Design a protein with these regions (language model features):
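Walker A (P-loop) phosphate-binding loop of P-loop NTPases
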Residues: 2
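Walker A/P-loop
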Residues: 6
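NTP-dependent small-molecule kinase module
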Residues: 15, 101, 131-168
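ATP-dependent small-molecule kinase phosphotransfer cores
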Residues: 22-84, 127
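Short, well-ordered alpha-helix to beta-strand connector turns
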Residues: 62, 86-87, 140-141
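Short glycine-rich anion-binding loops that position phosphate/pyrophosphate groups of nucleotides
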Residues: 71-73, 95-97, 150
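A glycine- and Lys/Arg-enriched "phosphate-lid" helix/loop adjacent to the NTP-binding pocket
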Residues: 85-134
Length: 168
């Protein structure tokens, strides 16, 4: 959440000539309602069930693509297994300061960060989420890339280079 997955994904997809899919946007199109509304009406557990089913559909139907997942997608064991076994997963690893900066400057609509928190509260909340998710991200990813201090174009080039190494 807040590491630039969608921005980096769009750049990467252009460089690779693949389509780009943001899973949250795909879900909104399929469901006819916003992620926030799904969270409100179905709760987080309900959203995660919808998200995991959508992930399976996208992986099955869409072919070559760059797919941006929500920060909590991999909290579902089924989703994490699917991603690890059927895709090449890149963990864009950012420190708390980078995430707080990005989320403060480009807040978006993020149900997991409701209440428009101040930077201290945001930093604490991001730390909590990172500690809950870090091990799953690490186990699921085929590539772990530290992105602190790097521009998105550089990150996309590094992903391409690392993916080529995996292919050799």
């Amino acid at each position: 959440m807040g590491c630039g997955k969608s921005c980096i994904g769009k750049i990467l997809s252009e460089k690779l000539g693949f389509k780009f899919i943001d899973l949250d946007i795909w879900i909104e199109g399929q469901e006819g309602r916003s992620v926030r509304r799904i969270f409100t009406e179905n709760g987080e557990a309900g959203f995660r069930r919808i998200e995991t089913a959508a992930l399976g559909e996208v992986i099955e139907e869409e072919g070559d693509m760059v797919l941006a997942l929500g920060g909590g997608t991999l909290t579902s064991a089924a989703a994490a297994t699917m991603v690890h076994e059927r895709t090449r997963c890149v963990y864009l690893k950012a420190g708390i300061d980078t995430l707080v900066f990005n989320l403060t400057n480009w807040p978006g609509d993020r149900p997991m960060l409701d209440g428009n928190p101040d930077s201290k509260t945001l930093s604490r909340r991001i730390g909590e989420l990172m500690s809950q998710r870090e091990s799953t991200y690490g186990r699921t990813a085929h590539i772990i890339l530290d992105i602190d201090g790097k521009d998105y174009d550089t990150v996309s080039d590094e992903i391409i280079a690392l993916a080529h190494i995996l292919d050799s």
